[in-house]
Amino acid sequence: ALSLHHQMNGDGKSKNDLNHIERPIRRLLSILGDKPLSDYTRTDANKFKDWLYDETDHALNKSPLSTSSVKRSMDSVNSVFNLANQEHSLKLDNPFAGLRYRKQEPKERPAIPVEHIAQIQGLCQKFDDDMRWLIALISDTGLRLGEAAGLERSHVDLSAEVPHVIVEETDSRRLKTKTSKRRVPLVGVALWAARKALEASLQNNTSFLFPRYNKQASTNSNSASNGLNKWMKEHIPPQYVLHGFRHAMRDRLREVDCPQDVMDEIGGWSKSSVGQTYGQGSSLERLHRYMKKVVI
């Protein structure tokens, strides 16, 4: 069924896209066994769903999946099952469809206060290594962790009139939304971090800015998140995590009266009005003008 899915839907898909389909299928096979589609039952489906919630990657010391992540995994399973069912005219009821999922309160990831941002940025410059470059880059761009950790040399332009990074989909990283594709000016410690990471990448002859998180087919954001958040908790209150820099960037831009359309373009957030979807968007110079104002 998985081979059929790749055969019919694989064209134009990145390795990362295919991995997002393969991973839950391989997990399912390890838990339920490889058997004819007709032999899978509703009990099997619920067993796998519960395993995703409670046991996923415990051996790797990763946290259990959230409901949204479990649903994404089950969507992949449903996609593979439904395609095989349709193409082979099996006329089977899909036991993985319409499952009930646990209700979970969304995790609060508060914006990091400016004083703690300044503290972390100072420590990043003091430690001056690749892990701290990644934190510094995120702190003054508001990039998502996966976006920053997966950057390649070709995504950094320091010679432009406005130095910037390019966020786009690659084989190792897919974008969260269509609006995630963007150019983000480099200011403050983010500019310092990008220079450092680019120099190291050139010296080590690697295409990635942060190769420690790109040793596999896809960017290992989980590894980055665990290590970087652990370090941050040693220096600022534990409720503040890496993603809090992204929330803080939104607040920092508000404080300098940045127009909402510019905020959305900087962060790759969904457009708040239909009108914002027209045209080419703001110039780098316009984005840069507001980002310079938020440097601490």
Q: Model-derived features: where do they sit?
A:
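Short, aromatic/basic-rich helix-turn unit that serves as a nucleic-acid recognition element
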Residues: 1-24, 37
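Short, charged phosphate-coordinating catalytic segments
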Residues: 82-94, 138-162, 260-262
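Catalytic-site neighborhood detector that most strongly recognizes the C-terminal catalytic loop/helix
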Residues: 107, 111, 191, 215-216, ...
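C-terminal catalytic core of tyrosine-transesterase DNA break-rejoin enzymes
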Residues: 136, 140, 147, 223, ...
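Conserved tyrosine-mediated DNA breakage-rejoining catalytic core shared by Y-recombinases
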Residues: 150-195, 273
